[in-house]
From Swiss-Prot:
Enzyme Commission code(s) on record: 2.4.1.330
Keyword ATP-binding on entry: no
Entry keyword set: Glycosyltransferase, Transferase
Top-level taxon: Eukaryota
Residues annotated for an anthocyanidin binding in this entry: H9
Reaction(s) catalysed (UniProt annotation): beta-D-glucosyl crocetin + UDP-alpha-D-glucose = beta-D-gentiobiosyl crocetin + UDP + H(+); bis(beta-D-glucosyl) crocetin + UDP-alpha-D-glucose = beta-D-gentiobiosyl beta-D-glucosyl crocetin + UDP + H(+); beta-D-gentiobiosyl beta-D-glucosyl crocetin + UDP-alpha-D-glucose = bis(beta-D-gentiobiosyl) crocetin + UDP + H(+)
GO molecular function: UDP-glycosyltransferase activity
Annotated protein name in UniProt: Beta-D-glucosyl crocetin beta-1,6-glucosyltransferase
InterPro entries documented for this protein: UDP_glucos_trans, UDP_glycos_trans_CS
Described purpose of this protein according to its UniProt entry: Glucosyltransferase catalyzing the beta 1-6 glucosylation of the sugar moiety of crocetin glucosyl esters to produce crocetin gentiobiosyl esters. Weak activity toward curcumin glucosides, but no activity with flavonoid glucosides, coumarin glucosides, 4-nitrophenyl glucoside or crocetin. Involved with UGT75L6 in sequential glycosylation of crocetin to crocin (bis(beta-D-gentiobiosyl) crocetin).
Keyword Transferase: yes
Active-site residues (renumbered): H9 (proton acceptor), D108 (charge relay)
Organism: Gardenia jasminoides (Cape jasmine)
Length: 444
């Protein structure tokens, strides 16, 4: 397995690895030492025998020392540098494939150049998409049918979001063409297969549309959410869960924007005022880019912490997200709608209060609304979030009748996903076994 260098990618790879080893596979996960350190403590018991970690060392440069060989805490201006460094590690990855001789490779959909390496070693390979299928369907449609409206109107980008998305898409296309020229891409049967962190229960029509549009075979592997476990993060984690236990059922909202997006001061102020106006309990996870010397109280409105008192908790850097979402006192989740956060919300039946920031997040937010898993905080005409709109969305989700309806829909979605998960994983295990058999037979 070869994931992209982000915690939000490597976590689903680990969960998929666990489910495949339950079905008789042995797995190697290849990544940088700092990323492997993040998951090492989560490989326990029987999995410590069937899941092995393989270090991939990127070129070490003054501007990208080893602790920056991950997107977690990476200053945004170094993202392109990290991508170039990973591309520069192709020879080492090739040597790893030569040494391990795996039966097949599962690689990140963003790292398309991996396929050419696997061809050189006669190893079948499939892509793994850790984002939503609806997002991929939307952008593939724009590329294949420019000027024609996407056939699913619930999934759209506002004018403000389209401008940002166009720039990101152009950069991604240029990066892909530089490191994986279209003329050099292999065209094996397995190269049209995507494993996807999703379920037909929520994205079936988008899975079918991608096959109709581009003959891409999208195979769902379920939501791949780790079971809540007590994390070894010391007294702060224990104190937070104890505090949550003093609150009434579904009275508290979790606020978190993932490991890669850093809120501006203006965004933090609007969210803070929105939480204050809503009058609900909250846990707010705040993060600053690595190296920034800012205390949370310096970034928040003056007097905010004193005014909210015991109604809220500010946590810097990390909180046991799955444990908080699984807690009966949690009734809502204000998030950026990174795909991992969306599927965790579905897994634990907690309505989403969507505040998408960039990349795939706006499209994920629209899917959340479409399937009834939450509501979106609408930006103003300038593309900014407003405190009153934030407070309104929180109250709708947590206090008003709409919140009860959303919770009921969320539980229905959760049930439908759970019904399909085992069958979907069994089908994927069967297909991977078949790929290996066919490759072995063709080599003999």
């Amino acid at each position: 397995m070869f994931p992209w260098l982000a915690y939000g990618h490597i976590s689903p790879y680990l969960e998929l690895a666990k489910r495949l080893t339950d079905r008789g596979f042995a797995i190697y996960i290849c990544s940088t030492p700092i990323n492997l350190g993040f998951i090492k403590k989560r490989i326990t018991g029987k999995y410590s025998v069937t899941i092995k970690l393989v270090e991939l060392h990127l070129p070490d440069t003054p501007e990208l020392p080893p602790h920056y060989h991950t997107t977690n805490g990476l200053p945004p201006h170094l993202m392109a540098t990290l991508k170039r460094a990973l591309n520069g590690a192709k020879p080492e990855l090739s040597n790893i494939l030569k040494t391990l001789k795996p039966d097949f490779v599962i690689y990140d959909a963003t790292q398309t150049w991996t396929a050419a390496l696997t061809v050189a070693h006669n190893i079948p390979a499939v892509k793994f998409l850790t984002s939503s299928v609806s997002m991929l369907a939307y952008f593939c449609h724009l590329f294949m049918k420019p000027g024609i409206e996407f056939p699913f109107p619930a999934i759209y980008l506002s004018d403000f979001e389209q401008a940002k998305a166009r720039t990101a898409a152009q950069d991604a296309r240029a990066d892909a063409e530089e490191n994986d020229p279209a003329a050099e891409r292999p065209n094996r049967d397995c190269d049209s297969i995507f494993l996807v962190k999703s379920s037909r229960a929520i994205e079936g029509k988008y899975i079918d549309y991608l096959f109709d549009l581009m003959k891409l075979k999208m195979l769902p592997v379920g939501m791949l959410v780790e079971e809540p476990v007590k994390d070894d993060q010391g007294d702060n984690s224990n104190e937070l869960i104890q505090w949550l236990g003093t609150k009434s059922q579904r009275s508290t909202v979790l606020v978190s924007f993932g490991t890669e997006y850093f809120l501006t001061k203006e965004e933090m102020e609007e969210i803070a005022h929105g939480l204050e106006l809503s009058e609900v309990n909250f846990i707010w996870v705040v993060r600053f880019a690595m190296g920034q010397k800012i205390r949370p109280d310096e970034a928040l409105p003056e007097g905010f912490l004193e005014r909210v008192g015991d109604r809220g908790r500010i946590v810097e850097g990390w909180a046991p997200q799955s444990e908080v979402l699984a807690h009966p006192s949690t009734g809502g989740f204000i998030c950026h709608c990174g795909w991992n956060s969306v599927v965790e919300s579905i897994e634990f039946g907690v309505p989403v209060i969507a505040m998408p920031m960039h990349l795939d997040q706006p499209l994920n937010a629209r899917l959340v609304v479409e399937i009834g898993a939450g509501m979106e905080v609408v930006r103003d005409e300038t593309g900014k979030f407003d405190r009153k709109e934030i407070a309104r969305a929180i109250k709708d989700a947590m206090v008003e009748k709409t919140g009860e309806n959303t919770r009921a829909k969320m539980l229905d979605v959760k049930g439908r996903v759970e019904l399909k998960e085992k069958q979907e994983l069994d089908e994927v295990a069967e297909l991977l076994t078949q790929l290996v058999t066919e490759t072995t037979q063709s080599s003999n």
